[in-house]
Amino acid sequence: MWHNVGLTLLVFVATLLIVLLLMVCGWYFVWHLFLSKFKFLRELVGDTGSQEGDNEQPSGSETEEDPSASPQKIRSARQRRPPVDAGH
């Protein structure tokens, strides 16, 4: 009789461990493939590590360069345009 009870408990505990392991693995893969791309969810979880979707530092450096770089880009774009003929 004790053999049957022990076997039943072993199966029950093994099933719970397998289910928990699958849930943890599923969360890990979903987090890394999809959810970590959203800054809002990273802030909720408290993940401050650099992720693929985290572009704060490059965008911060670009915004500092934008005031000086954007007029040059506009000028170069205007210079490349062919002159418009008013007679046609």
Curated annotation (Swiss-Prot):
Stretches for region Disordered: 48-88
Residue spans of biased composition, Polar residues class: 48-61
Specify one Pfam family: DUF4750
The residue ranges crossing the membrane are 10-30
What kind of membrane protein is this, topologically? Single-pass membrane protein
Q: Which residues carry this modification: Phosphothreonine?
A: 63
Specify the protein name.
Answer: Small integral membrane protein 13
**Whose protein is this, by species?**
Mus musculus
Q: Which gene encodes it?
A: Smim13
